[in-house]
Structures are given as C-alpha cells and as structure tokens.
Amino acid sequence: MKKFRFLYLVLTLVLAMSLFLTGCSTPAEEPAEEPVVEEPVAEEPAEEPAEEPELAYPERPINAVVGFGAGGPTDVIARGIVPILQEKVGEGIAITNTPGAASATAASNVLNTTPDGYTLFFGSEIMSVWQTMDTMDMHPTRDFIPVKLVAEATPVLAVPPNSPFNSAEELMEYAIANPGELTIGTAGPGTVPHISGLLCEQYLGAEFTFVPFLGGGPAITAVMGGQVDATIEMVQSMVEAHKGGNLKILASFTNEPIPGLDEVVPIGTVYDELSPYIPYGPYFGLFAAKGTPEEITDYLQRKMEESMADPRWDEYCENLYLTQIDYSGQEAIDYLEEWTSKAAWLLYDTGAAAKSPEEFGIERLDK
C-alpha cells in the first residue's frame, strides 16, 4: 500500500513541476524579419541629342555668276562682298561675268545647272522686269531663292567732261527743245538707268534716244569717250571718274543729297514732278536656284551675314555711297515682290513694257 502511495506522490510531484515550468516559460520569440533593402535601380544614361551630320558643303570651288560686264554696278558690288564670303566658307568663289539680255542669259545658265549651291547668281533689280519686258519668263522669287539682299544704289546723271551741259536743267531743256537728239547710254531696256530716263520723258517732256550696252561699265566708258551724250548709271560706278575729272555728274535721282557728294544736285529738288517716284535705285544680292537644298541656302545665308558684319564691307559701302540692306527669307521675298510690282507697273505706265504685268499676276501696289 505504501508502495502505491509513494508512486502516487512521485507522479504528483512530476506533474506539479511540469505545470510550474510551463507557466514560467515564455513563448520563444520568432526571429525578427530583416528589413528588405531594395537595391538602387541604376538610371539609364539620358540619351544625348544626336549630332547633326556635318554639312559636306562646300567641297569644291563655287561659281558666282554676274549678268553684266566688269566695271558695272552689279559687278562692283559682287567684287566687294564675294571675296569676304570666300574667306568665311573656306573655299574658292570665282566671279564669272556673263553679259547678255539684261542679265537674263546668266540667270538662265544658273537655272540650267544642278541646284546644289555650286553655281550661284549675283543679281540685281533687272530680275524684277524680265517678264514685263518680255526678256525671259523668269521671276526673282518664283525661280530663285534670295539668299541675301545686301545693298541698294543711287542712279546719277552724268556727261562727258567737255560736255556743254553743266546742270540737269540745261540738259533737260535741250532734250525738250530737240526731241531725240540727245543719246543716253544705259545698261539695257528695263534697267534702272533706262527707267530713270523714261521718268524724265514721261513727267518732264524730254525725249532721248536710248543706247543699250551690255552693262553699266561699257555705258560709262562710252560717255567718258564721248560716244554718247550722257549716261544714267549707279553712283558707285562713276564716283571715281567724277572726282578724277573724267566725267561730270549733274544730278542724283534722289530727293536728298548723297552724303559726301554735296555738289551733286538731287533732281527731286529741281523737278517736283519726279519727286514722288524717287529715290528709285536698284537692289543687289546673292541668289540660289530654286530647288537648292535648304541646309545649303541656310549655310550660305549665315556666311553672308558673317561677311556683312565684317568691317571691310562697311568701309566698302561707305566709299562707294551704297546703302546697306540685310534681307533674307520671307523679308527678302516681300521686298522683291514689292519692288517687282513698282518697277513692272512703272514700265507699263510709261509705255516701255512689252507686256502688261497683269499677264503674270503682278498686282499694282499703291505708291
């Protein structure tokens, strides 16, 4: 019996100890989860803008074609700006004189080449009247891209040094009293010199016999040699001969004196009838054939701007009494359209035009 009680006591003690240990123990803590550290995502390098491919132009010499002979105003101005442009582009630029058909021959030659920027046209105001004068069906903004218009010039009336005329009034009075007797050398029909003479016929009653030459240079040579009685040409082409006593400039086709040439009388101060139509002078600029790639014409435009910013160009214009202009893009197009309208309708109104400007869609603008 004692044996069973002893066994019972042992079991009870074991059970009690078990319960005690269970009550005193705490549940084991679960291992803490380690924080998840996200690996930084490497940023992809930003794409750099693709470099524009280098323009492969010019890779050979460029030809700048002038539609009049050497020594005329277009040639003189081209020879002032083109050498500077040549430095800026780093390639040779040859000036080629191709006179004929009031520069339309040269322009046509340019249009018949590949429009790749290697054959350019250095043109002038005569481009605006080719259609009206029935010279050739070409238009300055339809067939060409005006890269840069650079200058305007002033026409002047000049006579040989031994001429009996010492003023514009004396010459006009003689031309009124003796119709057709006086010969006036010009660069050809439709040019500014020709139109200036027509204005004198239309509004002053004078009457001349116009003698066309293949450019202003030959016309000036003719007047200095006495082959014609007078010429109307750009001042920059005659100022040295005037100062040297080889011809006499009687008047400028302006309403104000030419700075530096105070002895030259503005014809608008003598004849009020001409005042509304002057100053009437030509423009000059560099043109590319339509179809020339835009990147090439843009390049040429930038290089022309650099050339015109060169102090040598400023000095050149000042010495030759040129008015600088700086037109390209739409501004040049608007200028050319306005000039074309003015010139074409003036020729038509004076009876010198072969065709009406209306045939070519040239609108008449207000004066």
Feature map (PLM): residue ranges:
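C-terminal motif of bacterial Sec signal peptides marking the signal peptidase cleavage site
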Residues: L19-G23
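C-terminal lobe and pocket-closing loops
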Residues: V239-A309, E358-K367
